[in-house]
């Protein structure tokens, strides 16, 4: 571009005409002032310079005015209608119960355990849901026992066919839109009576919410997975068999063969011990002795003095396995056994679905967001609830409709996988509805490794070296 004999090089992008004109104007103004002061311009060249400057300023004003007019909304333009979202009801049912009197306060579960993980997942899912047309809404139901919840639901169903109330929280059927409610079950039990109660509870809820999809986020009982395999129930918490197999793989890797087992009096403790016995048989470990913890010990008064005597056996052992779901004794065993050996299970080296020191594969940002939101670490129950919500949201993102059968078909399809900060895609075992996943082997302050460990292979999926039963639905373990 030339003005007179002075060339201006097009160093400004053509898309920014206003800026280009402004820079050209400033450059010419400076040039004209300099030329006038030095007296080097003739009158004719001065007039050309002034004319060029005027043209640049005029073009700049015109472009600014056009841009301003385009930015202003038209008075006749109608406001865009707001998008309508399909609401996915998320009901978190928690059977709180009471902690035994001997459980230390620092080992008790947080009051918002599970619901905190679900809340983080809902926040993430609703961001994507704004573009796909769905939103999760969380409702919490807390009762002391399963039987009380069943009674509340049955009584409310007699008075109203469309809704039920439990603990003053309404559970409403969503049959008008056929959107499947997502029910997260937070209840621990491991004997046949309680497992049957959970199945009956699901049946009771189905009478109110016939199209619901259920997720078990706390119960690790293998019996529940076998007996409820025909229900629309998925298990995001690892089973006891998965945890026991992970510990057994670690024992084989460390060449530890002789194990002494100590277990508590709860049904969960018996279930964990039974799973470890199956793992010991599968991986050819030897259980030298098995003892049940005695409540007569007063750890606060005796200051752990009786622990070495209790852990004394007729045969030597190389490790101690503990099953203590109520946190009554296992915390007192590390570095206090008769033989100086590692403790695993409920204390020492634990097999967990999630540990707060896990930071690989993007897990660090999830840990940070959870810690910022709730000022505590994320545990395996929180992650199981997070995983349940994420699985449903992921199914919706893959194009599944929000009806029960659509979600079930997506989750149980052969090619379904889910990324969940564990380094390997998660999938679901069709015969037990258990989520395949890595198991974290960790102690109180650090992550040791993830199972399955190197060298343990499977013909189809290495994650099936952890807890995959060689049985079919309804077969006995």
Model-derived features with residue positions:
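N-terminal secretory signal peptides that target proteins for export/translocation
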Residues: 1-46
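Disulfide-bonded cysteine motifs in exported proteins
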Residues: 27, 44, 50-51, 224, ...
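Bacterial N-terminal signal peptides
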Residues: 52-61
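N-terminal cationic leader/targeting segments used for protein routing and processing
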Residues: 6, 20, 32-35, 45, ...
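Small/flexible residues
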Residues: 7, 15, 42, 47-50, ...
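Intrinsic-disorder-associated interaction segments
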Residues: 22, 51, 456-459
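Extracytosolic ligand-binding ectodomains
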Residues: 2, 66-477
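Hydrophobic alpha-helical elements and their junctions with loops/disorder across both membrane
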Residues: 14, 37, 58-59, 163, ...
